[in-house]
């Protein structure tokens, strides 16, 4: 809330950040209406400490393996998807600049954004999309949302920045399914996710599963919005009373589950 008052984020970015951290729209709205001043022009700077309600040794920076709120938060900090949903529930292209669908919703074509780089400086391309999305396919896939993609026949590379998705049956909801955090795009052939493997607004500075992670602003992020904070620390306080007391004492800035 203080970041909003001080102009580090605007209304849309504040609501988006709260949503990424698992805070409901109603709760986020109450923060906004209680703020003493509304920020018209966001400024950069500051940091946030966010406390989730659970964590453990299975905490992961690999989006496809994520199952918890804390995994969700870290995936949103470090990665982008093909499509994203805004706080007004409308769908917009993210790593996909645009997409089209045939008349019976069995074939989607995605035009990918150019000039995007991963955190290690390598260029994002169609190869990364195919590798990331193919990880969801098959009965032995590690994905917790592989059922969403049961009708996928194949992902096809048309050119370096165009991919086609072919389905065995109509699915008009596929764009919504692609907004799931497990469907974030990661660099092709990544095996070590401890330093992150995404194109997102924040780099991984430190990651200790079951303890905390620290994320710092990506200086080469392809967007000019969505990363006004210098750093985000993500941890968990499993006891609800301790979590609330930490918030009231100012030891943390945000939390899930009152």
Set out the residue ranges of the language-model regions.
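Aromatic- and charge-enriched surface segment that lines or borders ligand/interaction sites
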Residues: 98-142, 164, 246
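N-terminal secretory signal peptides
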Residues: 1-13
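N-terminal lobe/hinge region of extracytoplasmic solute-binding protein
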Residues: 51-103, 134, 197-199
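C-terminal segment of N-terminal export signals and the immediately downstream linker at the start
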Residues: 8, 29-54
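Surface-exposed binding/hinge segments that line
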Residues: 111, 145-187
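Gly/Pro-rich hinge or "lid" segments in bacterial periplasmic/extracellular proteins
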Residues: 85-90, 171, 176-233, 239-241
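N-terminal export signals
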Residues: 13-36
